Amino acid sequence: MTINFKEGILIPIDKPYGVTSFKALAHIRYLCSHALGGKAKMGHAGTLDPLATGVLVLATGKKTKQIETLQQHTKEYVATIQLGATTVSYDMEHPVSATFPTEHITRELILETLQQFIGEIEQIPPTYSAVKVNGVRAYDVRRNGEHIELKPKHVRIDEIEVVSFDAEKMQLVLRVVCGKGTYIPVSYTHLTLPTT
């Protein structure tokens, strides 16, 4: 079977932990270009955080014109959340920057609180994100020590399921079905569990 990279194909890859979506794309582009003996036109549909793993869809040739359409499809994520602690990047890239009481948190309270996130919501992307500000990625601005404020954006969350909750460790695993542009770390960072 001959693959026509110029006409285009879609290549779903399992993006590894610690690799940016762009670096994953660059590596596959290099391999394809080497195999073809020339430069392969490629792009990726959507962006996964460097610390996220999962399916990243790459497109070649004429299929790159479908990237915008592909990004409109619903996505599904599974996230492990440590309740009672946060970091400046809302993930494990930085050390814990603040802690909060957790004695009042129950599975019932979590289920009740999660309902406020279902539907169309406004979400402020994390400053350590791939959002571009004046042509520069927000995480590059932050890593240069500069302060940045991002504007809220409308996102859609269709479903949130509690996969597991470990009350002793205060760890929560969620499955989230959502639309384009949803930042999962932000969704659970703003999961305010009120004290009684």
Language-model features and meaning:
Residues M1-V186, L191, T196:
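Catalytic/RNA-binding core of pseudouridine synthases
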